[in-house]
Amino acid sequence: MNPSTRSCRRLHALALLSVASVVALCPVQGRCAADDLAPPHLQKSGTATQLVVDGRPFLVRGAELNNSSASSLDYLRPLWPRLVASRLNAVLATVSWELIEPEEGRFDFKLVDGLIEGARENNLRLVVLWFGSWKNGKSTYQPLWVKANQARFPLVKSEEGRSLNTLTPFGDATCESDARAFAALMRHLREVDGRRHTVLMVQVENEMGVLEESRDYGAAASREFSGPVPAELMDYLAAHKDALVPELRDLWTANGSRASGTWTEVFGPGKPAGKVIPVRTLCPPMTEQEHETAWRGLFWPVDEIFMAWRYARFVNKVAEAGRAEYPLPMYVNTWLQQRDHAWPGTYPSGGPVPQVMNIWQAGAPAIGILSGDIYVPEFEEECARYVRCGNPLFIPESRGDARGAAQAIWAFGRHDAIGYSPFGIDRVAGPDFELAQAYDVVAQVSPLILEHQGNGTMTAVLVDHEGPPQSVRLGGYQIEARSSARAGGPTPPERVAGLFISMGPNEFVVVGRAMNVYFSSATNPAENVGLGTVEEGVYSDGHWVPGRRLNGDETPEWKALRFPAERYSIQHVKLYRYQ
């Protein structure tokens, strides 16, 4: 028996043992077991969308491994304890096409099995990242039998006919082979994990799109580009016209809201002939007006929309093949447009950036979440753009420093995020990792966060150390958070978060750091608001365990909550009003 088969059987036996235990504990017609055995899925809760695992909503406190880490179980072995110490509950890890199908039709899942076993041994969950045809706008993770056969698996062509190092999404054989491999992976996950649910979600491809060109100029792509826009896309746009993102709606309107036509007739001009895309990290020379048009909008719109549709159709076929085997939630991620590379082709053209999210929703209904890898300074703006059109917020790549810790807390509280994940956890994992301390507090209040998602009783702010106060309205109160640091104390991070949960009339749970929090009446300016009781404490198994009762100097001017600069903490406050 080879190691792969032995590993598979061991995992299968463990899964069956787990199921037997659940049934034994829930003997009434196996009802509890049936609930638990439903695969992870997305489910609406009020205005929020939640990830449901084993019958309960699950908040992903994630981190992504470096791209090559999961290619070696020996490399991972000493890393697992550090991941646990980082207070994660989920690890995002690569599964690459080249390693599971080194020869066409021969699959090897021993790395996948080892990854699952490692996660289980450390009480962690997994989000699998399928690196198939694309990674970061290039094609480097497919098997050699794909790379070496460009006649069967063609590459994107530049305007002058040069081959780019990325597979074209117009290659039928590429799509079929990718989908077949992905289906085999999902079938294997169902066989070894369909009852344990170690794997929560799957990312399909990675940051796909064309770099160094705004679109594919190959023969197949050019034929499609010169033809009509597919009726299914036009029908979708017409049916959702009033709900389209404004970038796309305004563009379509400006071009006459045509119900049919060629790509350029419907969506406007593409890249001017002969315009050369420079190195991807630099923007072409632009006037100020051109830059403002490109930034946060659609520049050379038809090229990006055309490629978005084709990538979406390709990815949808791959996702459908996988979901037919095991219907885990699936998402796609993207490299975002940025100020210093704002034209399509200086970032991957055709990926699910916010301005083309409706194209992706039309073309890839098998994908449940469109996600941005948010490293840009405009974090709040990007999150707001991704929660449009019913899209849930999941952040698969971002920062893991103090700023990232604040972003995670804010995303959970402000936008009902399903999860947050910094990239490259290998380098920094451990209890002293900035995000670890924030995740510890998030873990404590996760039951509250999940309970209050989608019902308007939770919000959050981001406060800059030298910035203005931030104010929100919640539960009949105006809440103002001001940056604060005691003289002689530690220097606070440049940005912190405050999370506010309304527990009922005049009662709040607040998470914060390096800030003072003030409450005032949101309905009657003549009313004063007093602090009835203030407790610091922790949550243990969902129950509040009070520590100190705060008063005096710990409540500045007897009217504010004070959060120390050293770390995030939790306070529980009851308020009263007086004239």
Model-derived segments and spans:
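Bacterial N-terminal signal peptides
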Residues: L14-C26
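N-terminal carbohydrate-binding accessory modules
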Residues: A33-N89
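Short, acidic/polar
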Residues: A70-V84, P348-G363
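Aromatic-lined substrate-binding rim segments of carbohydrate-active enzymes
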Residues: Y75-N149, Y311-E325
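Active-site region of glycoside hydrolase catalytic domains
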Residues: E121, K135-H341, A362, A366, ...
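Catalytic-core region of carbohydrate-active enzymes that cleave or remodel glycosidic bonds
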Residues: V315-L328, P354-E451
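Aromatic- and carboxylate-lined catalytic core of secreted/periplasmic carbohydrate-active enzymes
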Residues: I409-A526
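C-terminal beta-sandwich/jelly-roll accessory domains of carbohydrate-active enzymes
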Residues: G488-T491, E507-Q579
